[in-house]
A protein has these predicted regions:
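Non-heme Fe(II)/2-oxoglutarate
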Residues: 1-63
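Catalytic core of non-heme Fe(II) oxygenases with the double-stranded beta-helix
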Residues: 40, 44-49, 57, 61-203
Length: 204
């Protein structure tokens, strides 16, 4: 059964020529949950409750502790203070996003994939690296008509049931998504982002 009430995200990489967006989200906040049918609201409120659970965050922080310590110093996982915000994402064919690191207001980014089978296995998020050569190419691309690739592709997480990824946002957390092809359905996922400030908006 489909869920209504998605919000179009106006990210420049996601926009179609007609002004619509290939990426939509239902933020799990009081406003958007309140617009749902009673059954949907009950279901997604339960998901939000689980994702908000401190034990979930603590487990992520334990698994990602080396990266968190690199960013925040020699802290213990139980001493990390961060605020989870989550939502349901729908990416249509044509969606893409260039390699980016995520904004520094985010401490940890997590994404949980929701395919029904393995047909969309190639739809996962990709990781990249950019060397000194890549940074030079970036500057040359600003003045050249010929655009050369700045990034080297490292791997793509398989978009499979009961899978996903998590990473600490930092200077090298380059990730993105090549264009989703036509005719293979929408890409659904849950994202749960841990922010350092509880007042940062999450697609509100």
């Amino acid at each position: 059964e489909s869920v209504s009430g998605y919000k179009n995200l106006k990210h420049k990489d996601a926009m179609r020529e007609d002004g619509s967006s290939t990426r939509q989200v239902i933020p799990f906040n009081e406003d958007y949950l309140g617009r749902m049918s009673e059954s949907d609201r009950e279901f997604f409120s339960l998901i939000k409750e689980v994702l908000d659970d401190e034990r979930i965050g603590r487990k992520f922080f334990q698994l990602l502790l080396p990266g968190i310590q690199e960013r925040k110093g020699k802290k213990k996982a139980e001493d990390i203070i961060a605020f989870p915000k989550s939502g349901l994402f729908c990416d249509a064919s044509g969606y893409k996003i260039r390699p980016h690191k995520d904004v520094r207001t985010k401490l940890v980014t997590t994404q949980m994939y929701l395919p029904t089978d393995a047909k969309q296995e190639s739809f996962g998020t990709s990781l990249y690296t950019r060397s000194i050569k890549g940074r030079i190419i970036r500057e040359l691309n600003k003045i050249s008509k010929t655009q050369r690739p700045e990034f080297e592709h490292l791997e793509t997480f398989p978009f499979l049931p009961n899978s996903g990824y998590a990473f600490v946002v930092g200077d090298k957390s380059w990730h993105g998504r090549e264009e989703i092809p036509e005719g293979m359905g929408n890409r659904y996922s849950l994202m749960n982002i841990y922010f350092e400030d509880k007042d940062v908006p999450f697609y509100d």
